[in-house]
Structures are given as structure tokens and as C-alpha cells.
Amino acid sequence: MQKTKQKSGTKQKLTIAAIFGAMGPGLLAALSGNDAGGIATYSSAGASYGYKMLWMLPVMTVLLIVTQETAARCGCVTGKGLASLIRERFGVRKSVLAMAALLIANTAVTISEFAGIASGLALFGVPASISVPLVALLVWMLTMSGSFQRIEKILLLVSCVFVTYIVAAFMAGPNWGEVAVDLVVPNIQNDPSYVSLVVATIGTTIAPWMIFLAQNNVVDKNAGEDDIVLQRIDTVSGSIAADIIAGFIIITTGTVLFPAGIQISDAADAARALEPIAGQWSTVLFASGLVAASFLAACVLPGVTSSAICEAFGWERGADRSWDEAPVYRGIITAIIGISAVLVLMPGVDLFQIMMTSQVINGVLLPVVLVFQVVIAADRHIMGANRNGRVWNVLTWATIAVITVLTVVMFVLQAMGYGA
């Protein structure tokens, strides 16, 4: 009787209104991945190798769906964030490993967001010495007060100017036959730059922080087991939308920049890919989207990181807690923002290289988070009937193995001097 009631309740929720009402956590988490580092990585892929890296996107879309759906399902079933589940399942010592990986990866990405903000505002003539301190202060104030949630949808909307890459791709006139072939035929090269770009693409598409964000967002919405189907729709749609945009960024830059031999070294180079649609306004369009996307992620990352660490070790957390009540939570946020801003302002730093390197770090550390996630999601005692199936487990472990091998290959090729 109880199962029938739950089943009919789930069916009742599967209305258009319910589906749109459930949209948010998965969509926000996936689209937030198209941040400064994401734009830099996808643009570099197209500018450096044309369409040859498109084959990764269908694969990455499936794996993104797997990891994000797993995160959402774990949140619905347990009502807890991933950090809390890691502590309960593995204990404090292994939680230290997971949180260290998350802290390193997220700090690197936050640095890249400030690099993106500095690069974008520089296209408007605002020097980094002015833009970075002011934006860092604004990010800190919004994160500390919790008022960021009031503007996150606006920022997400503005950052969606990158949807223009879809139009720009068609206007640029790519060879669609070549696009179709490269979309399904893998291309592997024994070049450390290519391999590191593959790792960066994985890291920016399936970022560790996105997994924690997706699960926390579901928990914050008080979603339960009856909401799993709705959250799955949200996750799948968000993942597909994010990777479609990523694909068209590669197609656009592969059509406009690659044939001209233009290697992307800064934001101005990347903006040239939008000239087919925006002409002289391409710089303004690109800069607006880059700043909005970077600011969105810069506001999300410190809070996600601090919340996860405090959750893992049982410390007070939340924007509604004062410094006296949650000193570690507020201290971690302040440290991440401060360190990121200072490093970006250091003389002679390559802002574009910062954005790229952060995604490689993401990719290298991703397996650490995925191991914890897949073990938890497959645990009958934690997940019950909603534990991972065989296909989900195989895909996740395969992802872990592939990234680990790619990381080793990347470092070996660099050590041997290939591509030098």
C-alpha cells in the first residue's frame, strides 16, 4: 500500500509545472561549470586542434550525467551532503584526504575565476589593480551575508550570452561533415599539451565542486526519494545544455581561429571567435559573459568549499552564523577569496594560463572525489533500493581509471620531453 502511494505520488509530480519547479540544482551546477576555466579550455581546444577534441563531449556528457545524477540521488535519499556522508562512511582520517583534494581544487578554480574577472574587465579598460580588489570585496560581502542567492539567477542569465556561440558557429560556416566525424571518432595524440588539454576538459566538465554543489542544492531544497525522478530530469537537462554550449564553443573557435593559426593567449583572442555574429561588439559580448560567469562561480566556490569542510568535521557553518558561532566557516571563505585575489594581482602572472592550469588540477584531483562518491552510492546500508546500479558503477570506475591513466601519461610525456 505504501509503495503504491509513493509511486502514484511520483506520477502526480511529473507534470510540466512540477518539472519546471524542480529545475534549478542540476541546471545551476552544470551551467556553472561553463565558467572562466571552462570557456578558456573549450576555446583553446578549438583554436589549437580544430574539431579534433569534439569526440570528448558525448562521452563527457554521459559521465557528467552519471556523477551529477548520483549526487542528486544521494541527496534525495539521505538528506545529507556528500561531505557528511564521507565522514560517516569512511571516518575522519579519510575525510581529511577528500577535503584536502576539494580545498586544493576549489582554491585553484577560484583563482581562475578572479583571473577571468580581471581578463574580462580589462577588455573594458579596467585594470586588474582596481577590478580584482573591488570584486573580491563584493564577493566576500555577498558570500558572508548569504545574499548572493538573490542575484545568482541574474548572473546565470547574463553568463548565458555564451549561447551566442551556437549562432556564431552556424554563421562561421563550419565543415559539418568534418564536425560529425570528429564528434564520434576519437583522436589521440602523444603530445603532452594535447593530453593536458584532455585532462583539463574532463576537469572543467566534471569539476569536483560541482558534485558537492549539486548534492547540497538538492538537500537545501528538502527533496526526498519521491523527487528523484524530477531531480534526474533536472540533472540530465542541465548536463546536456552545458555540454551543447561547450561543443559549439569548440566548433566556433575551431572554425574561426584554428584555420587562421590564432592561438589563444588572452581573453581578447578568445573574443575574436564571436566576430561572425557580433562584429565589433564581439569583445563586449564576450567580456560581459566572461565576467558574469566568473563572478557567479567565484561567489559559489568559497561557500561550497567551506561548507563541505565544516560539514565533514562537524563545525558550525552557514551564512546565518556569526564569526563567533562559525569562525572556521567564515575563515575558510575569507582565506580562499583573499589568496585568490592576491595571486591574480602578482606581477607578471599569465591570467589565461591560470584559467587553464586550474582545470588540469581539477581533472587530476577528480578521481579522489569520485572514489568516495561511487562507494557511498553503491552502499546498500546508505542508499537502500536507490543505490547505484551496475552500469553506473562501471561508468564511474572507468572514469576514475581513465583519468588516472591520462594523468600518468601527461606527466610521463612531459618528463620525456615530447612536444617540446
Describe the predicted segments one by one.
Residues 65-73, 77, 218-219, 240-269:
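Extracellular/periplasmic helix-exit of transmembrane alpha-helices
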Residues 36-44, 212-241, 262-272, 385:
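Hydrophobic, small-residue-rich membrane helices and short re-entrant helix-turn-helix hairpins
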Residues 2-7, 41-46, 69-94, 260-275, ...:
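Flexible loop linkers connecting adjacent transmembrane helices
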Residues 92-93, 129-134, 237, 241, ...:
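Loop-to-transmembrane helix boundary motifs in multi-pass membrane proteins
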Residues 97-99, 123-144, 161-165, 327-342, ...:
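Transmembrane alpha-helical segments of multi-pass small-molecule transport proteins
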Residues 17, 44-69, 83, 87, ...:
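Extracellular loop-to-transmembrane helix junctions
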Residues 160-187, 195-216, 372-381, 406-418:
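Hydrophobic alpha-helical segments and their helix-loop junctions in multi-pass secondary transporters
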Residues 29, 56-90, 98-108, 253:
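Juxtamembrane transmembrane-helix boundary signature
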